[in-house]
């Protein structure tokens, strides 16, 4: 029997995966089986860390707001500020409040002092 040459489809699929992992180190960018595993792992990590990224930033914003608010008033905290904002129906999200805490602290103090009264 004569030898039959394989098609190009499997090679094309592997090259596509190889392009994805070309920046990986060592065998993770050379060996086909390892490449496939690393691609799955990378895509899974990217999917998982998109939510984790949002969670971490929200936590950072809360910490910044709390630190700035506690500097201003002794018995005032983040939770009471947010509660008062909701009661007054002020639409300021945590990201904006954290930016105010860093860039324009006096403005944040004005808002918080207005909430206390």
UniProtKB/Swiss-Prot annotation:
The keyword Lyase does not apply. PROSITE patterns: RIBOSOMAL_L20. Its main location: plastid. One of its GO terms (biological process) is ribosomal large subunit assembly. CDD domains: Ribosomal_L20 (cd07026). Keywords: Chloroplast, Plastid, Ribonucleoprotein, Ribosomal protein, RNA-binding, rRNA-binding. GO terms for molecular function: rRNA binding; structural constituent of ribosome. Transmembrane segments: none annotated. GO terms for cellular component: chloroplast; ribonucleoprotein complex; ribosome. It is found in: Plastid, Chloroplast. Belongs to the bacterial ribosomal protein bL20 family. Binds directly to 23S ribosomal RNA and is necessary for the in vitro assembly process of the 50S ribosomal subunit. It is not involved in the protein synthesizing functions of that subunit. This is Large ribosomal subunit protein bL20c. The lineage of its organism: Eukaryota, Viridiplantae, Streptophyta, Embryophyta, Tracheophyta. The gene is rpl20.
């Amino acid at each position: 029997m004569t030898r039959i040459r394989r098609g190009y489809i499997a090679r094309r699929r592997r090259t596509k995966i190889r392009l994805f992992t070309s920046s990986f180190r060592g065998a993770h960018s050379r060996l086909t089986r390892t490449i496939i595993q690393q691609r799955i792992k990378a895509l899974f990590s990217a999917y998982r860390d998109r939510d984790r990224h949002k969670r971490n930033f929200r936590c950072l914003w809360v910490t910044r707001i709390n630190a700035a608010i506690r500097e201003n008033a002794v018995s005032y905290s983040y939770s009471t500020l947010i509660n008062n904002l909701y009661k007054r129906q002020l639409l300021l999200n945590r990201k904006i409040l954290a930016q105010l805490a860093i860039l324009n602290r006096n403005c944040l103090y004005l808002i918080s002092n207005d909430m206390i009264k």
